[in-house]
Regions:
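A generic "alpha-helical surface" signal
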Residues: 1-2, 9, 115, 140-144
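Oxidoreductase and adenylate-handling cofactor-binding alpha/beta cores
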Residues: 1-27, 40-48
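A general structural signal for well-ordered alpha-helical segments in protein cores
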Residues: 7-8, 88, 118-125, 146-149
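Conserved glycosyltransferase catalytic-site signature
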Residues: 8, 34-38, 139, 146
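Phosphate/oxyanion-binding loops and surfaces in catalytic or ligand/nucleic-acid-binding neighborhoods
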Residues: 17, 70-77, 94, 149-159
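NAD(P)-dinucleotide binding in Rossmann-like oxidoreductases
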Residues: 28-35, 45-121, 135-138
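C-terminal helix-rich "cap/oligomerization" subdomain common to oxidoreductases
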Residues: 45, 126-178
C-alpha cells in the first residue's frame, strides 16, 4: 500500500481494530506484481467505518486523512516530507452547527516544522536508557497494522487468488518479533 500503510496505521489509532474488511486491489496501469490502486472499506466492532484509497496512478502526491464526527470534522492534508511533494501540512478543524446552512466554520492550522522523528527517537532512546516500554509505535502495533494491510489484500478475492494468499496469519510471527 506504499504511503497507504501510514493511513492504515492512523485509521487503527483513531478508529480501533477493524473487524470487517472489503477491498478492490488493482495493478491494471503499471501491470507489475504490486498494486497501482487499493480501495478498502472497513468497519470496527463498535460500528466505526473507515475508507481508504491508496494510489500509485494519481500523478500528484496527495495525503488526506479525514475524521468525521457528529459535530464537526478533522481534516489532515499534506506531509512535511523531504521531497515537499505532498504539499503543505495542514489540519482543518470543522465546527458543524445546525444553523450553519451547510457552510460550517473552519479553522486551518498550518504546520511548518515536523518534530515527529525527533520525538520518536527521544522516546525510543528513553525507553532503552530507562528500561521503559515504548508508548507509541510498538512492535505489536506495527504487526497489527501489517496484518490489516494483509487482510485488505486478501479481501479482494481476485487479488488473493492471483497471488495465492491465505487468510491465515500465523500469530507465531508476532511472538518471533517481540
Amino acid at each position: 500500500l506504499d504511503q497507504g500503510i501510514h493511513l492504515v496505521d492512523m485509521m487503527r489509532l483513531f478508529a480501533g481494530e477493524f473487524t470487517q474488511v472489503h477491498s478492490f486491489i488493482s495493478n491494471a496501469y503499471w501491470k507489475h506484481d504490486i498494486e497501482d490502486n487499493a480501495y478498502a472499506l472497513m468497519k470496527t466492532g463498535s460500528g466505526v467505518v473507515g475508507m481508504l484509497h491508496s494510489s500509485a496512478t494519481q500523478w500528484r502526491h496527495r495525503f488526506n486523512f479525514e475524521i468525521t464526527l457528529t459535530k464537526g470534522a478533522l481534516i489532515l492534508s499534506g506531509i512535511l516530507s523531504g521531497s515537499k511533494s505532498y504539499g503543505a501540512e495542514t489540519l482543518t478543524v470543522v465546527y458543524a452547527n445546525e444553523d450553519d446552512g451547510g457552510d460550517p466554520r473552519e479553522v486551518m492550522i498550518r504546520y511548518n516544522q515536523d518534530n515527529s522523528w525527533q520525538e520518536e527517537i527521544f522516546e525510543f532512546t528513553d525507553s532503552i536508557l530507562e528500561n521503559k516500554e515504548i508508548k507509541n509505535g510498538s512492535v505489536k502495533e506495527a504487526f497489527e497494522t501489517m496484518k490489516l494491510v494483509y487482510q485488505i489484500y486478501c479481501a479482494d478475492a481476485i487479488w488473493k487468488s492471483k497471488y495465492n494468499l491465505t487468510s491465515q496469519i500465523p500469530e507465531t510471527l508476532l511472538e518471533k518479533t517481540v
